[in-house]
């Protein structure tokens, strides 16, 4: 079994990615378990931030690293909150505070203009000096609901409505979510590439 460090401090992402990766026989260790501090996210895109995080974890641990950078892009807000999704309402904002700020920003936006996409970029870095890290992008289209619904998931899941399923992301089972989510898509692309390598 190959040990890989997961370069994130977000407990929701750790749970979700560790569960998915364990299904494929990968020994995933969260960077927090190895005493690795979070990398500073100074990039302007999901790709830049994911590469920064993966390289930092690989340099600190000497292990291959997987990093995720993801967020919500809302059409009516010009793609915001985007790379600032986790800190939309402030640096130490809770999921609930971020969600409330987003709903307030969309208060007068009609249903047909509430389109949004979750984006996930996964980076697999074989070692800290890897000149060609593997980069995978998953995108999940939906609509921002007017009110939260559901208790599963994390972040914006309670207001991310998936018309094709008739539910918010927070109303989906783990299996349903992984089959269609941005993170599930990016992970499938990554695992397919690793199998073929």
UniProtKB/Swiss-Prot annotation:
<dbReference type="GO" id="GO:0009117">
    <property type="term" value="P:nucleotide metabolic process"/>
</dbReference>
<dbReference type="InterPro" id="IPR020922">
    <property type="entry name" value="dITP/XTP_pyrophosphatase"/>
</dbReference>
<feature type="binding site">
    <location>
        <position position="40"/>
    </location>
    <ligand>
        <name>Mg(2+)</name>
    </ligand>
</feature>
<feature type="binding site">
    <location>
        <position position="69"/>
    </location>
    <ligand>
        <name>Mg(2+)</name>
    </ligand>
</feature>
<keyword id="KW-0547">Nucleotide-binding</keyword>
<keyword id="KW-0546">Nucleotide metabolism</keyword>
<dbReference type="GO" id="GO:0009146">
    <property type="term" value="P:purine nucleoside triphosphate catabolic process"/>
</dbReference>
<dbReference type="GO" id="GO:0017111">
    <property type="term" value="F:ribonucleoside triphosphate phosphatase activity"/>
</dbReference>
<dbReference type="Pfam" id="PF01725">
    <property type="entry name" value="Ham1p_like"/>
</dbReference>
<protein>
    <recommendedName>
        <fullName>dITP/XTP pyrophosphatase</fullName>
        <ecNumber>3.6.1.66</ecNumber>
    </recommendedName>
</protein>
<keyword id="KW-0460">Magnesium</keyword>
<feature type="binding site">
    <location>
        <begin position="8"/>
        <end position="13"/>
    </location>
    <ligand>
        <name>substrate</name>
    </ligand>
</feature>
<feature type="binding site">
    <location>
        <position position="70"/>
    </location>
    <ligand>
        <name>substrate</name>
    </ligand>
</feature>
<dbReference type="InterPro" id="IPR002637">
    <property type="entry name" value="RdgB/HAM1"/>
</dbReference>
<keyword id="KW-0378">Hydrolase</keyword>
<comment type="function">
    <text>Pyrophosphatase that catalyzes the hydrolysis of nucleoside triphosphates to their monophosphate derivatives, with a high preference for the non-canonical purine nucleotides XTP (xanthosine triphosphate), dITP (deoxyinosine triphosphate) and ITP. Seems to function as a house-cleaning enzyme that removes non-canonical purine nucleotides from the nucleotide pool, thus preventing their incorporation into DNA/RNA and avoiding chromosomal lesions.</text>
</comment>
<dbReference type="GO" id="GO:0046872">
    <property type="term" value="F:metal ion binding"/>
</dbReference>
<dbReference type="GO" id="GO:0036220">
    <property type="term" value="F:ITP diphosphatase activity"/>
</dbReference>
<comment type="subunit">
    <text>Homodimer.</text>
</comment>
<feature type="binding site">
    <location>
        <position position="177"/>
    </location>
    <ligand>
        <name>substrate</name>
    </ligand>
</feature>
<feature type="active site" description="Proton acceptor">
    <location>
        <position position="69"/>
    </location>
</feature>
<dbReference type="GO" id="GO:0005829">
    <property type="term" value="C:cytosol"/>
</dbReference>
<dbReference type="InterPro" id="IPR029001">
    <property type="entry name" value="ITPase-like_fam"/>
</dbReference>
<dbReference type="GO" id="GO:0036222">
    <property type="term" value="F:XTP diphosphatase activity"/>
</dbReference>
<comment type="similarity">
    <text>Belongs to the HAM1 NTPase family.</text>
</comment>
<keyword id="KW-0479">Metal-binding</keyword>
<dbReference type="GO" id="GO:0035870">
    <property type="term" value="F:dITP diphosphatase activity"/>
</dbReference>
<feature type="binding site">
    <location>
        <begin position="182"/>
        <end position="183"/>
    </location>
    <ligand>
        <name>substrate</name>
    </ligand>
</feature>
<feature type="binding site">
    <location>
        <begin position="154"/>
        <end position="157"/>
    </location>
    <ligand>
        <name>substrate</name>
    </ligand>
</feature>
<dbReference type="GO" id="GO:0000166">
    <property type="term" value="F:nucleotide binding"/>
</dbReference>
């Amino acid at each position: 079994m190959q040990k890989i460090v997961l370069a994130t401090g977000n407990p929701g992402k750790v749970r979700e990615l560790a569960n998915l990766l364990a299904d494929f026989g990968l020994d995933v260790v969260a960077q927090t378990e190895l005493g690795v501090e979070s990398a500073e996210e100074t990039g302007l895109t999901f790709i830049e931030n994911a590469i920064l995080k993966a390289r930092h974890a690989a340099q600190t641990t000497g292990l291959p690293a997987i990093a995720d950078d993801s967020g919500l892009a809302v059409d009516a807000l010009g793609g915001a909150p985007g790379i600032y999704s986790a800190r939309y309402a402030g640096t130490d904002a809770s999921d609930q505070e971020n969600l409330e700020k987003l709903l307030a920003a969309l208060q007068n936006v009609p249903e047909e203009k509430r389109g949004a996409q979750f984006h996930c970029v996964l980076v697999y870095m074989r070692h800290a000096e890897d000149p060609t890290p593997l980069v995978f992008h998953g995108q999940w289209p939906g609509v921002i609901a007017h009110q939260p619904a559901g208790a599963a998931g994390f972040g914006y899941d309670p207001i991310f409505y998936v018309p094709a399923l008739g539910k918010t992301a927070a109303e989906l089972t783990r299996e349903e979510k992984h089959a269609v989510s941005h993170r599930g898509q990016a992970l499938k692309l990554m695992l397919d590439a690793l199998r073929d390598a």
